[in-house]
Amino acid sequence: MRPEIKQKIEQSRERKRENKRYSLYLYGSGITFATWGSGVRISSSPPVVSAGTFLYRTAQCREVEISMMIKDILAYGRPSVSFEVFPPRKDAPFEPVKSAVARLARQHPSFMSVTYGASGNSQANTVAIAAHVQELGVPALAHLTCLGATDESIASETLALRQAGVENILCLRGDLPKDSAEGQAGPFLHAVDLVRKLKPYGFCLGGACYPECHPDCAHLEDDIVHLREKVEAGLDFVTTQMFFDNNIFYRYLSKLRDRGVTVPIIAGIMPVANGRQISRICRLSGTYLPSRFKAIVDRYGDHPAAMLDAGVAYATEQIVDLFANGVNAVHIYTMNKPEVAERIMANLKGILGGDPVE
């Protein structure tokens, strides 16, 4: 990395550090709420899952530093629900995505992840949408892929994220752009190479894992070895690929813990609103479709309204079961559909209320 780029990253980190102190104001009955530079989160009883809002007794403090890093949010120990969005494709309008993001932010997720466009379609748009998420007071998790990248391109993109206030990066291998010639994979052949590259620069780093084994890996045990390498290189948390059978996840989680993977594991849940789409996704990814859920898709897959109802109900049931069994972090693949997130969060309202915060 060129010294001047490294210096810019460090300067941006220092500015961010200086701006991470948020004022607290009295808001009735001895409850305080947090404000930050991009706006104000005001609520007499904000949801516990809201990452940007913490309650304090006024006698305890008047000012507090609130972390937007996912590792700190997960360490809080409360049930956590996060959403995933994808940026507009190259030259596509921003407004529909920004509108969806704004609606999702009103559900007070713990964070929102923003995917990384392939083949140059939306890499710059990832930064723009992540910045918009941050402006709404929600921590952003920016996806970053490394296959085909160079030291310079990684430095440039991480600097852009840092300047946008993004502190969380999901480190992924990704795929080579279709127009790349053979041998242009670059110095970052695996996600672990990206983790090692980024670890010194103070980002909170996440990774991906596959309860049913990565499609390119022959054996689950080998896949777990690769995951452990990424964790040892510096991952702070891991998010799973979607699954539709919680028992598969529980067995996988047990294997990870037995093999020394101790970082938080976020369970990835996809509410299915399109029967034909999910059949294709499962074929490509090798995700197991339980007979109980397959019957739902077969029965309602050609009826969008019914499939939406059934998909939301099934995803809600999965999440409730996960929370009941001690899995406190769930990531919902919302596919830019705020209406899906709204319905699920309404179903979980009582569960996410939790105990009063002291």
Map each language-model feature to its residues.
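Short, acidic/polar
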Residues: 91-104, 126, 152-158, 219-229, ...
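Active-site beta-loop-alpha junctions enriched in small/polar residues
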Residues: 85-88, 115-119, 143-149, 174-175, ...
